[in-house]
């Protein structure tokens, strides 16, 4: 008889395998949400939102959680940024960053896709990790700002 913990462990192992497949095949979906000035009736920028492309994950946060567990969150984030920059070349862009990506140092590498964007870019730190985590990321955030990008905390009202 399979115990509940064993089922959870098997499911986690399946999700980790699925993340490896997604990242290796560069199969990350993306949609763009317009950020508009309703008074001027014009689009100011677009927010690039990663989308789950695997049936095993019920949501995008679940996909990123599995990527953290699999040690692939930096690669998944980089794929997201690459697609966003390639597909939204003519507008200012808001990019969500999972705070766990700071552990890998990829965000400040000169070859990161976000540095190819020729319009204003705002890095949004996602609400998935409590705010206390941000003190550990101060030097990375400072370096991103020095490179001319704006910073924002995404969904600040989420309770973190």
Whereabouts are the PLM-identified features?
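Juxtadomain coupling helices with adjacent low-complexity linkers
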Residues: 2-3, 16, 58-62, 68-88
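Active-site core of bacterial EAL-family cyclic-dinucleotide phosphodiesterase domains
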Residues: 4-66, 153
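Short, contiguous strand/loop micro-motifs
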Residues: 6, 22-24, 71, 125-128
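Catalytic core of bacterial c-di-GMP phosphodiesterases, primarily the EAL and HD-GYP domains
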Residues: 44, 72-141, 149
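Conserved protein-kinase N-lobe ATP-binding Lys motif
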Residues: 54, 67-71, 99
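Interdomain coupling helix/linker and adjacent catalytic-core signature
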Residues: 59, 158-160
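Walker B catalytic acidic pair
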Residues: 127, 154-156
């Amino acid at each position: 008889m399979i115990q509940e913990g064993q089922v959870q462990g098997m499911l986690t192992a399946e999700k980790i395998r699925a993340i490896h497949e997604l990242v290796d095949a560069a199969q990350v979906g993306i949609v763009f949400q317009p950020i508009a000035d309703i008074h001027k009736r014009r689009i100011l920028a677009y927010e690039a939102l990663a989308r789950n492309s695997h049936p095993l994950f019920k949501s995008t946060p679940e996909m990123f959680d599995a990527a953290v567990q699999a040690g692939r969150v930096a690669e998944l984030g980089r794929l997201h940024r690459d697609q966003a920059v390639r597909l939204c070349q003519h507008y200012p862009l808001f990019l969500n960053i999972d705070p766990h990506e700071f552990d890998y140092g990829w965000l400040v590498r000169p070859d990161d896709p976000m540095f190819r964007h020729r319009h204003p870019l705002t890095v949004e730190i996602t609400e998935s990790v409590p705010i206390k985590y941000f003190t550990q990321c101060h030097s990375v955030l400072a370096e991103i700002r020095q490179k001319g990008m704006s910073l924002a905390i995404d969904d600040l009202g989420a309770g973190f």
